[in-house]
A protein has these predicted regions:
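A short glycine-rich, Lys/Arg-flanked "PGG" loop and its adjoining helix->strand segment in the class I
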Residues: 123-135
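Class I (Rossmann-like) S-adenosyl-L-methionine-dependent methyltransferase catalytic domain
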Residues: 1-40, 49-97, 121-124, 138-165
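A short acidic, Gly/Pro-enriched loop at the edge of an enzyme's catalytic core
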Residues: 96-108
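A short His-aromatic
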Residues: 115-117
Length: 165
């Protein structure tokens, strides 16, 4: 899985990503509001990719850490954060073993990551993200819709019916 994402991100032009991130509102206001309502101060962007959520979270006053399995994605995210004069502590790590201590964050957001994992790994990832969240904290997941467009992308279907891209 790591090789797939590293290969995918190596082909990405950071300038195009910057334009894309600026042209759309990646983190919906409802997500930001939910985090504020729950008193979240520290938040982890799990599977941060190009840093779109990290940027929106930092711009809204959160102390942000994040990780991605692709070192190239983390590099692009850091560049975009610096260009926007925003701060987040990002690192390369996998979602099954983040390297954070128990209860590090008030909240965790995980955008469109779990649906790229086999079911057993997705369940383990949920446990890991709950582990790094403080008791009483909030964990928010989003999933890609399974549109016809996605079904035409290269994938395999596991025995349990999961689509793995």
């Amino acid at each position: 899985m790591e090789r797939f994402w590293e290969h995918s991100w190596k082909r990405v032009d950071p300038e195009r990503v910057a334009g894309y991130v600026q042209s759309i509102d990646m983190a919906p206001d409802a997500l930001i509001s939910a985090l504020h309502r729950h008193g979240v101060k520290t938040v982890c962007d799990a599977g941060c990719g190009c840093g779109a959520y990290a940027m929106k979270l930092a711009a809204n006053g959160f102390s942000v850490c994040g990780f991605d399995v692709s070192s190239r994605a983390v590099e692009i995210a850091q560049t975009l954060l610096e260009k926007a004069a925003l701060a987040a502590e990002l690192k390369t790590a996998g979602i099954l073993s983040t390297g954070y201590a128990d209860g590090t964050f008030d909240g965790v957001v995980c955008r469109d990551v779990l649906d790229h994992l086999p079911r057993a790994e997705a369940a383990a990832a949920v446990k890991e993200l709950c582990r790094i969240t403080k008791p009483g904290g909030i964990v928010i997941f989003t999933l890609d819709p399974l549109d016809e467009e996605y079904r035409t992308e290269p994938h395999r279907v596991n025995a349990d019916g999961d689509y793995v891209y």
